């Protein structure tokens, strides 16, 4: 029988306490809270520092170790099919809820009185977002550039090609594969060290958020926030919960299993901050490395359920608040634009707002200056977006793995029943005594 870890050593408890202290400090000492922003930024940068090499190692090791290349194409095809269906459902749910509840009705905001300069940078960034540009951006100018910029899709593109090439070499490429596996062990050990700083990062980020924007900004547009949070909760419990039940597992148990990652995301407002740990945890949950390596990184651009809900709700809210007519034709057009635009949102803080700006620019019917209405509360809404995105990608990984018969269901049930013990304590060690990454 394993000795139970003391409560104060649990990362879950440490991050939760840090977030609470950050909220209190930001509220009562806002200037001090704002000054702590570098703590949150520094932690997120440390995580981003190792995301690219971890994705590379995971994807290459998974693909190169597969028996057949057909299974890679099958996994990718099923993943994209799942992403498109579920994210479309999320967009429609957001559209339905905002039309039924109408959180912006009665505000009668005059667009000419809004401070458009406050959102000019977002509008300019959004105007540059095009479908062709997005697709071309997946191809890196140089391999080094992809890793230097930390662009997930560019790194994924190169990693898949590298994995295919290494697989074709057969036994001749095995020394390279072994080297990559050992390099992965080093990267995951770095992640273990960085995660010890998670409470500090969450504390600094939350103190800054409350200190900068204040609790008062939550009250002003609280109706929209409440609608959005409730919609995200219902989406997770009803839609994702239904998908989980149909595939033989519980979404509640899955949420409990990834609770530490969810708290890290809550503190940083970026689902990207939990990506390295999610790669390891989903594999430990019973999904094969090849599936995890493809689904998780791709999902960070193509399966952002929380962002999809936010985009439709925010766009129609702006129309309602500014008394802009949105008939059925306009709303269908909005939905079609978002089906494409939502795929360009990465799992980083602020990306959803940029995609919203791009959508308003593309539709043309909605006032881009209306972004100023939700600029103050967007940072608070980003938590719900990031949490929903993370849960959605966890569900997608298990479901796709089951579809392609690359899921150990016994291991899945055992891990979910255990509640997910700390990742660092469950790693086996190799003959050098070094903690390993997930088994291939």
From Swiss-Prot:
Function, in words: Responsible for the transport of dicarboxylates such as succinate, fumarate, and malate from the periplasm across the membrane.
Disordered: annotated segments: 419-440
Protein name per UniProt: C4-dicarboxylate transport protein
A Pfam family per the record: SDF
Tagged with keyword Transport: yes
UniProt membrane topology term: Multi-pass membrane protein
GO cellular component: plasma membrane
């Amino acid at each position: 029988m394993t000795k139970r870890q003391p409560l104060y050593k649990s990362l879950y408890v440490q991050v939760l306490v840090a977030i609470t202290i950050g909220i209190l400090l930001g509220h009562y000492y806002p200037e001090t809270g704002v000054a702590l922003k570098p703590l949150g930024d520094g932690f997120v940068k440390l995580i981003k520092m190792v995301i690219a090499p971890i994705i590379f190692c995971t994807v290459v090791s998974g693909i190169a170790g597969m028996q057949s290349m057909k299974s890679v194409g099958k996994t990718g095809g099923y993943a994209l099919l799942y992403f498109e269906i579920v994210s479309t459902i999320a967009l429609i749910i957001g559209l339905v809820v905002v039309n039924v509840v109408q959180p912006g009705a009665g505000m009668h905001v005059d667009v000419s009185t809004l401070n458009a300069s406050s959102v000019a940078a977002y509008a300019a960034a959004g105007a540059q977002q095009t479908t062709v540009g997005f697709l071309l951006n997946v191809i890196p100018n140089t391999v080094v550039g992809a890793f230097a910029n930390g662009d997930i899709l560019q790194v994924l593109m190169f990693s898949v090609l590298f994995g295919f090439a290494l697989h074709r070499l057969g036994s001749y490429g095995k020394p390279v594969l072994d080297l990559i596996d050992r390099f992965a062990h080093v990267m995951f050990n770095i992640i273990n060290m960085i995660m010890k700083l998670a409470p500090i990062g969450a504390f600094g980020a939350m103190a800054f958020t409350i200190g900068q924007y204040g609790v008062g900004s939550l009250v002003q547009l609280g109706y929209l926030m409440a609608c959005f949070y409730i919609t995200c909760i219902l989406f997770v419990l009803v839609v994702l919960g239904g998908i989980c039940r149909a595939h033989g597992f519980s979404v509640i148990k899955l949420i409990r299993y990834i609770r530490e990652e969810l708290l890290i995301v809550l503190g940083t407002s970026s689902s990207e901050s939990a990506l390295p740990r999610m790669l390891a945890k989903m594999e430990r949950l019973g999904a094969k490395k090849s599936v995890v390596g493809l689904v998780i990184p791709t999902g960070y651009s193509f399966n952002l359920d929380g962002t999809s809900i936010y985009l439709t709700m925010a766009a129609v809210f702006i129309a309602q608040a500014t008394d802009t007519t949105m008939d059925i034709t306009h709303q269908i057009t909005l939905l079609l634009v978002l089906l494409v635009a939502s795929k360009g949102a990465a799992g980083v803080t602020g990306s959803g707002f940029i995609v919203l700006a791009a959508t308003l620019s593309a539709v043309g019917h909605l006032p881009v200056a209306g972004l100023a209405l939700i600029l103050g509360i967007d940072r608070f809404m980003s938590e719900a977006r990031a949490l929903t995105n993370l849960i959605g990608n966890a569900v997608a990984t298990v479901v796709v793995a089951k579809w392609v018969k690359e899921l150990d269901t016994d291991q899945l049930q055992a891990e979910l029943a255990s509640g997910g013990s700390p990742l660092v304590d469950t790693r086996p060690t190799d003959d050098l005594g070094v903690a390993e990454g997930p088994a291939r």
